[in-house]
Regions:
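Nucleotide-activated sugar donor-binding and catalytic core shared by glycosyltransferases
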Residues: 1-120, 126-251
Length: 251
């Protein structure tokens, strides 16, 4: 058994749920642990795991093939001339009041900054859809769309100004594209991005999300500091490294 993305930890089984439990359980049975970073490797070592290989993250490999310089889309045409913000919010632990706080913070920004447009590829969960409809209504500078295919999603990220998310993978994808990320969670299994300065944990309180969102729109120095920070997730050769390690082990 090979575990790709091994060693990501929050050590809180409720956040993210159920991913944190699944990751810890998989590491117990894995014969090969492919850790994306040194921090992930150290987590595994503390747990007594062996056969650990730091390879970087395979999502960086994917970005090399999905992101296109000449990519276009009607929604991107709609957003031209504006600061395009990508919003992703779906975590089950954020359903209810935390997600309402997120949406209200975004709404306040839309009311205050006329040059901002937001695209929200919305989760299929009817509770998420109901809340989004209630908070955002028919705002002309908010596009709530169906989930995007990975090629489209990566290119939307690439052409955005910044990202607000409670997702996991976006925390690796966006920094690789030079995009600041506000993580609307209280914990993250990707502390490397926070340490590097590409991610900022802003929690789920409306005022804190709003304040940090506004700062990146108004303070160019702060924006550039986050967008130009180093990418800690590898050089895009993770897949090749993993294959070579497995082939060597089977020889």
């Amino acid at each position: 058994v090979g575990h790709v993305e091994a060693g990501l930890r929050t050590y809180n089984l409720q956040s993210p749920y159920p991913e944190e439990f699944n990751r810890q359980a998989t590491s117990i049975v894995a014969d090969y642990n492919f850790a994306p970073t040194q921090v992930s490797k150290e987590n595994l070592q503390k747990e007594g795991r062996t056969n650990i290989f730091v390879t970087g993250n395979t999502v960086i490999d994917a970005l090399k093939t999905t992101v296109q310089e000449d990519y276009d889309h009607p929604i991107l045409e709609w957003a031209k001339g504006s600061k395009l913000i990508m919003l992703t919010a779906h975590r089950r632990e954020n359903l209810g009041e935390p997600m309402e706080h997120m949406f209200r913070a975004v709404n306040r920004i839309l009311e205050e900054f006329e040059d901002v447009k937001v695209v929200y590829p919305i989760h299929k969960n009817p509770k998420v859809r109901e809340l989004a409809s209630k908070i955002f209504g028919e705002n002309e500078r908010m596009k709530i769309i169906e989930p995007l295919e990975v090629i489209d999603f990566h290119n939307f990220l690439n052409q955005s100004y910044m990202i607000l998310t409670d997702s996991g993978g976006v925390q690796e994808e966006a920094p690789s594209l030079g995009k600041p990320v506000l993580v609307m969670r209280d914990t993250t299994e990707r502390p490397e991005g926070v340490a590097a300065g590409t991610l900022k944990l802003v929690g789920t309180e409306e005022e804190n999300i709003y304040r940090n969102f506004k700062l990146l729109l108004e303070d160019q120095d702060e924006y550039e500091k986050m967008s130009q920070a180093s990418n800690p997730y590898g050089d895009g050769t993770a897949c090749q490294q993993i294959v070579e390690i497995i082939m060597k082990g089977l020889a």
